């Protein structure tokens, strides 16, 4: 159910290098957990990203779905240098490790190792919604599976200008969007569409994705630390 999210800007938006995003996670509008992502800088000046997600879907006190995901990324020169993730989805374990060298990338999952040359992948990106130039990417790596997917982005009307049950809203100019409640980008993959929301200042503040018919997963920023 959640795998699709992780498959889940050329704006002047780039968070400071000591930020924490604390998201409430909702399924069909009901809280099911959280996802906290912390950005810092190491002694080499590389950006370090660490995150932890925990979702639990319950009915009458019984847990029907449990999901835990931990991830750590290191970025340098606007490219992903290394990544390690561990995911438990209803008890099923998935792990991904990515390292880089002058020759290229080495990608390892529980299924198989894979080498990627610089000709094949000169600069890898994960689903790093918070990074400047995110919406200019044309391929992203799923941090849960290691799968590479072609992607495209479409700028949508600002968040408040696109209410539910309303008719079509004219596409705003960049200036109008800057003065409004924020930006929305539609991220499209081969099998999924994710709506990603940003504040007027370009801060990532949430996302929304249809996991299945009548199942909508939402990230809502609780606070920025």
Describe these PLM feature segments.
Residues 84-193, 206-208, 214:
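Solvent-exposed helix/loop surface patches that form functional interfaces
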Residues 1, 17-19:
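Absolute protein N-terminus
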Residues 26-28, 40-42, 52, 76, ...:
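A structural detector for beta-sheet-dominated domains
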Residues 29, 175-177, 202:
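Glycine-centered positions within short beta-strands or beta-hairpins
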Residues 19-101:
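N-terminal mature ectodomain segment of secretory-pathway/periplasmic proteins
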Residues 1-8:
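Sec-dependent signal peptide recognition
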Residues 10-15:
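N-terminal signal peptide c-region/cleavage motif recognized by signal peptidases
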Residues 50-52, 66, 180-225:
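Gly/Pro-enriched, hydrophobic low-complexity segments
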